[in-house]
């Protein structure tokens, strides 16, 4: 009887832990490098620049597309 109660409480506790942490992990990516690449991509897309075709002052390797900096390919 005691073992059954302990098992039920353990299962309920583990289920509650999973439900609590599930809300926080929905929008996160698993790998830090992927988050960094996405952050740099978003950072470059939101930086304003001067004239079209000129290097962006914010980031090395980015060029002005007319109004925003983008990675030069």
UniProtKB/Swiss-Prot annotation:
Domain of life: Eukaryota
Keyword Signal: yes
UniProt keyword terms in alphabetical order: Disulfide bond, Knottin, Neurotoxin, Secreted, Signal, Toxin
GO function terms (MF aspect): ion channel inhibitor activity; toxin activity
Signal peptide limits: 1-22
Cystine pairs: 49-59, 56-64, 58-69
GO CC annotation, single: extracellular region
Propeptide part(s) removed at maturation, as residue ranges: 23-47
Subcellular location: Secreted
Tissue and organ expression note: Expressed by the venom duct.
Metal-binding keyword on record: no
Major localization class: secreted
Notes on the domains: The presence of a 'disulfide through disulfide knot' structurally defines this protein as a knottin.
Family: Belongs to the conotoxin O1 superfamily.
Record-given protein name: Conotoxin Leo-O2
Species for this entry: Conus leopardus (Leopard cone)
